[in-house]
Amino acid sequence: KLRMTDVESVGGKNASLGEMISQLPTGVRVPTGFATTAHAFREFLAYDGLVDKINARLDKLDTEDVRALAEAGAEIRAMVEAQPFPADLQKAITEAFATLSEGNAAATFAVRSSATAEDLPDASFAGQQETFLNVHGIDEVLHKMKEVFASLYNDRAISYRVHKGFAHADVALS
C-alpha cells in the first residue's frame, strides 16, 4: 500500500495513485499494479558500471548544442535499453508480474514512469518520461521498463534538468 509519504521511494505518480486508492470508498474498483522503487532504478544503473558511463557522457555535454544533445541522449538511451537487469531485480519484477497477471495470458498492462522529482514547487518533470499501454507478457514488460528507464535521458529531460539546476543523479524513476 503506497501513500504520499512514499514519494522519495516510488515517485509522485505512484505515491498519488496509492494515496487515491487508499481513500476510495469500498466497492470502487481500481486496477491493481506494482511499482519498482527509486532504489531499484539506481541499482539497475549501478549494475555493471552503467551509471559511470552515463555520467561520463553527461559531464562533458553542452546542452545548448542541439546535435550533441541528441547524440548523447540517443547513446545513453541505447546503453540503458541494452543493460541487463540485475538478477534479483528481474526476479522480483517477474514474481510481481506473475501475481498481478494471475495466469491470464491475454492480460495487458501499462508500464509508466513515476519520477522522484515530478511534482516539485519550482520544477515540473511531469510528462517528460515514457508511458506504454497494452503491454503483453513479462518479456515485453521488462523491455518496456527499460525504455521507461531510458526515457529519463531523452533530450528534453536532460536539457530541463541542466537548465533547472538539478543533478542528473538526483532524479530517479520508479
Can you say where each PLM-predicted feature lies in the sequence?
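N-terminal beta-alpha lobe that positions the nucleotide/phosphoryl donor
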Residues: 1-174
